[in-house]
Amino acid sequence: MMQRLFLAVVLCLLAPSLAFAQWQDNLVQHHNAQRVGLPALVRDARLDRAAQLHAENMARQGRMSHVLDGRGPGARVCDQGVCRIGVGENVAMGQRTTGEVMRAWMASPVHKANIQGRYSRIGVGYSSGFWCVVFAK
């Protein structure tokens, strides 16, 4: 009985992190599915961190923007050790699923251009209804 209880507690603790990882992978898969004829984007943990921190900051401030606290995507990505020319970013708010946010981005020519751009790496973030995807060459 005690072993079952322990296993149940462990599974409950792991479930959110597993679901989060699945969500991240799913969003990257959606991006790569839209890049027909282009190389697949590769996840980069540093870009994930930049995107996640920005999503959390947007949620905390309750507004969607590429520039918060006077800092844009290039500076935020550089903070994570990826200091280079060729950074792009898509942000969104209000969508409840990865499919919804991808449909919104693909319906916008500017966001679609980022998704189908000449980038090789990607990082994704989400917090309380705010989405952020960062691209780098």
Model-assigned labels for residue ranges:
Residues M1-V9:
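Bacterial N-terminal signal peptides that target proteins for export
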Residues A8-L11, F20:
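A signal for specific C-terminal beta-sheet/loop modules enriched in small/flexible residues
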Residues L14-P16:
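N-terminal signal peptide c-region/cleavage motif recognized by signal peptidases
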Residues L18-K137:
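Functional surface patches built around histidine and acidic residues
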